[in-house]
Amino acid sequence: MTRTIVESKTKTAIIGFDQPFCVIGERINPTGRKILAEELERGDFSRVEADAIAQVAAGANILDVNSGAVFSNKMAEDPRYADNNFVEPMLMPEMIKRVQAVTDCPICIDSSVPGALENGLAACEGRPLLNSVTGEEERLELGLPLVKKYNVPVVAISNDDTGISEDPDVRFAVAKKIVERAADFGIPAYDIVVDPLVMPIGAMATAGHQVFTLVRRLREELGVNTTCGASNISFGLPNRHGINNAFLPMAMGAGMTSAIMNPVALPVSPAKVAEKRAELAALGLVLPEDMDDEALVQLFGMGSTLPRPGKEMEAIRAANFLFDRDPHGGDWIKFNKVAPKAGQEGRGRAGRTGGRRRG
């Protein structure tokens, strides 16, 4: 069985055909997150640490750390801060150190900048996953020597110098090329995790079918583990969670062994809570004085004010159970166990009083 080993200093994550689905948490990424990028520019890593903790609590097995930021406020003093090749090699090791300080979860180092990858590898304790190489000649020549030097597994993305092909046969050929080139460096297939590239189903009706077919071929013909950006499948569609929740178990059934995704259901913001309170007040509804924000959002099905596992995690855990990758359903039962209410700890059926006894 193909098994890809990713390790922190004290913990091991296994990506494999016979293993529970591996969730690679994607939240630590300043791309498209303006507030996080601004905080990183100020040297504030508190959100990075909070995201790491929340994702592990939600069930992430590996944490992706992406350093893709530019420091716009510092550009005036030094134009190099507008260049990822300048910023990321400095930023990546600090982000990794902060994550390692608050969790022992294995890390996936995510950057397209070779200097950031190498500095991240130097800062990482254990055996991280490197994200990524592509079929582009320049990326292969820069990335594969790092993989060999540090003896780490790598994500191989199925695009090359011609871009991303909509033809699944072309994407398979690119993946095969990467596996073969890696072998030339002495890198085994079990240390390569192929991303066959998930297309948005809203733009390409065959996107789901393509991925399932590709994953089967990659497993059967190349013997490699696979991953994907799970939320890509639902991009641009309403109720994205509904699509994601169906896609992930189907991908698992086809043989996909991991996904880069957000395991956390984002908390309801204070602004949303205030909006709901105002809406109820306008309707003349009077809430109990002692009803806090969490009780309010639970009552009206808004979610939670606290980070918690997302619905996608529920779908993955159910699929692990159904595919016999969760022995005796232990993880499923633990995940769905309801915490006892205050004052009821230790009370079970035998603790009830006043019931009729059978003679």
Task: Please tell me what each predicted stretch does.
Residues M1-V193, M199-G359:
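Domain-level signal for soluble alpha/beta catalytic cores
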